[in-house]
Regions:
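Post-transcriptional modification and biogenesis factors for structured RNAs
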Residues: 1-178
C-alpha cells in the first residue's frame, strides 16, 4: 500500500467547486467563539460540497488569519453569509422549506443513527456556542433535533467534531443507498 501524493487526489479547482452540485445541507453556526472551530467547519463543508454556511451572532467571519489557518482556503470555496440573529435565520430557512435541525441534547431528540433523510429535502443544521450549545429559543423553533449518542462521562463534543460527524452521516445518507 502506498500513500497518495497531493497531485493524485483529483482536487477540484475553485471554479469547478463553485459549479458543482452541492449537498443540500446548510450549516448554521451561532455564537461560535473559537476561530479554529469556524475554520475547521469551513474545511468540512468544502470536503462534502455543502451548500453554504451561515455565521450568526458573535461568530467571526472571513477574511480572518486565524480562521484561514484551519480552513486552508475553504473560505474561498464554500459560500457563506453573516446574520446577527439566529432566530430570524431559522424562520427564514423554514419559509424557504428548509428543514431546520438543532444539533443538541434535548428531550425527544432523534439519535443521529436513527435519523432518516428525504433525498429531495434541504436541511439546515444548527450548531451552538461551545459552552452553552444551541440557545433554547432556537431549539424551540427548529423543526427537530438530532443528538449524537455519547457513551462517556463528558457528553460534550467540540463543535467542529460534531459538525464533522453529522455532516458525514447526512452526506452518506443523502448520497448512497442503505
Amino acid at each position: 500500500m502506498r500513500k497518495l501524493e497531493n497531485s493524485e487526489l483529483d482536487r477540484k479547482s475553485i471554479e469547478d467547486f463553485k459549479e458543482s452540485t452541492k449537498t443540500p445541507l446548510i450549516l448554521v453556526l451561532d455564537d461560535i467563539r473559537s476561530l479554529h472551530n469556524i475554520g475547521s467547519v469551513f474545511r468540512t463543508a468544502d470536503a462534502f460540497l455543502i451548500e453554504k454556511i451561515i455565521l450568526c451572532g458573535i461568530t467571526a467571519t472571513p477574511p480572518n488569519k486565524e480562521i484561514h489557518k484551519t480552513a486552508l482556503g475553504a473560505t474561498e470555496t464554500v459560500a457563506w453569509e453573516h446574520h446577527e440573529n439566529v432566530l430570524e435565520v431559522i424562520e427564514n430557512l423554514k419559509k424557504d422549506n428548509v428543514l431546520t435541525l438543532a444539533i443538541e441534547q434535548v428531550e425527544s431528540a432523534v439519535f443521529l443513527q436513527d435519523f432518516k433523510v428525504e433525498k429531495n429535502q434541504k436541511y439546515a443544521l444548527i450548531f451552538g456556542n461551545e459552552v452553552y450549545g444551541v440557545a433554547q429559543e432556537a431549539v424551540a423553533i427548529c423543526d427537530g433535533c438530532i443528538e449524537i449518542p455519547q457513551l462517556g462521562t463528558k457528553h460534550s463534543l467540540n463543535i467542529s467534531v460534531s459538525a464533522g460527524i453529522v455532516v458525514w452521516d447526512l452526506f452518506k445518507k443523502l448520497n448512497w443507498p442503505n
